[in-house]
Amino acid sequence: MPRLVDHEERRRSIIETTWRLIAEQGIENASMRDIASECGYAAPGVLAHYFPNKDALLLASYELICERTNERIAAGTAGRRGLSALRRLCLEIIPADPLTVVEARVAVSFWQRAQTEDALRAVGREALLHWRGLVLGFLAQAEHDDECAPLADPDAVADELLNIMMGLHVTSMLDPDAVSGSRQRHLVERALARLAVTV
């Protein structure tokens, strides 16, 4: 058992190193040699014990970003419902702190590759569908609890919120000073405040 735990810890360490290099250098410039060197390995072949090739490493890296985001959402929304839970979900997804900024830089890099790589696209699509389902569930709770006016088109509301969150990933990368963490949180609060009045 300890050997399995060690193997998994090393895989995660390699993935986290990959995130850092992608965030600093871009996905195309983060070579297996650079990743191995940053991990303290003399040769990139050592990485093959954990990932057969760069594509497999990138896929695992994207999967772990989505997994960690989902873990934060689950922790942040535990014991909450309706608009309170929806607020926490939005705040966990947007890149508004140093950790999520790194994740966003990496995720945006993956989105470009996902246009031509089915496996990456499937991971991103699964995450979006999961978040959309959560948003719709929290909206239904908000309606039930009279936190917001009846929603004529909850699907459209869910799509609007998701596009705000995904859009903030892009605009915060292009202009981080203008689209700061506080600015992102303000935009999320504005969107949720509109729900409490009318849709």
Place the predicted regions along the sequence by residue:
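N-terminal intrinsically disordered/low-complexity leader segments
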Residues: 1-9, 199
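Amphipathic, non-transmembrane alpha-helical scaffold segments
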Residues: 7, 11, 62, 66, ...
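Generic hydrophobic, amphipathic alpha-helix propensity
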Residues: 10-19, 35, 61-65, 69, ...
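Helix-turn-helix
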Residues: 13, 20-56, 60
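Residues in soluble alpha-helical coiled-coils and helical-bundle/repeat scaffolds
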Residues: 52-56, 77, 81, 98, ...
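Hydrophobic alpha-helical connector segments
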Residues: 60, 73-104, 154-161
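Amphipathic alpha-helical segments used for helix-helix packing
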Residues: 85, 98-122
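Hydrophobic/aromatic-rich alpha-helical bundle segments in the mid-to-C-terminal region
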Residues: 101, 121-129, 143-199
